[in-house]
Amino acid sequence: MSFSFLEETALQYWAQLDCPTSLKLTILARAGAWAEVLTAKVAPEDFIDPEAFARANASVTFLKKNPFIPGFTDEDRGSACRTSWREGEASCYKANERLSPYIMHPLEDSMPAEFLRRARKILLGWLGPCPTDVDDGSLSYDVRPPLQGASLRRDERRRRTLADYARHGPGTTFSSSVANPTAADKYDDVLSLTRGSRFYLWNLTDSIWMRSLMARAARMSVDPLDCLNWSRGNRFTTVPKTAKTDRGIAIECTLNIYFQLAIGRAIRTGLRRNTGWDLDNAAAVHREVARKASVLGHYATIDLSNASDSLCTNLVRILLRGTPWLERMEDLRSTHTFMDGKWHRLEKFSSMGNGYTFELETCVFASLIAALLELDGRSALLGHDFFVFGDDIIVPTDTAESVVKALAWAGFRTNPEKTFLQGSFRESCGGDFFLGYPVRGFYLKQDLCYGTQAIYS
């Protein structure tokens, strides 16, 4: 049997690792069973030696995210991704039904209702005031204390507006006319937006962007609103994830994502100011806590499966009910997704691709965990007693099972392959540790070519 350069490289890599797992994969590969190679797994609990596990883990991870190996086709990956998306919507529907009584009767005297009220109180305390639409002259809560003897000018102390936080993201948008648009491309493109976000055009008043839009309308002799690309929602697409499945994301409208990112930055600011938990540096903290936990066993690491597609609308509405935060998020979210030629009404609150999804899900997970810990009579300081960074969660080991059950009740499933409640292995934010030793495997995600092809292909 002949092998490609990529396949030969994998065979040589496994030979160098020289362990039972790499031998098994070599036998499967030589037999042409690449699908079994790509889905092979190792369990940390089957090992007692960090080096032995590191070699076995490196064997199975090497090709796990490489789409150029035979075994699964592009159609297989796309189909698996769409199936996962539909499963997420079905899960959100069930969670919405389960939580709907707590929207209609928020003061209900029951343990679940008390749990949600406690989580809501905690979350609102973390977020603080929502940015205003325009500069209303009020003083800011988002300033660092001045140096001794210094004072802040009035314009330095004003409350930050949505426009102050807003920015373009690195990805494409619903109306982008080029494959990898820059910020300049997005300013020059036709502005796309949903009906709910139209009021946020006011935040662009007197900006270069708005003047450009007005100039375009004048050149075309049409109403400025006729120069806009109105959309019902976002558009579904996929990006590479593993050799077996793609990752589903949503491409948002230009105006929506511009201010969604503003909400996301404002949430980060609120968390940092009110809790000290800085999402800009939290991943490194997670890795260090996971490393120590793999030795001491005092913390468990939890990873949620399909987390972004599992955040149902009713949960967010319960936690943020009656606040400007919810009003702005509702305005800027997409209520529908265009996929496979038709529009789908969303049961989830926001998709991966929405500019505030990461920050929102971090806060939702953290507030639910904090409420659970407080109701159990424990301390619940984010960044001290427990840690949350997106769907990467670290909690005290003796509370882990309760946390998993509470999150499941709220509509979230743990990923059993990446959740470790006991044993000598912990994983969080890209850090894998066995008894304190880093054991994360290498992922080869690109194709390899012979000779000069590697330079020019």
Which residues make up each language-model segment?
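Core nucleotidyl-transferase/polymerase catalytic module
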Residues: 1-5, 13, 212-457
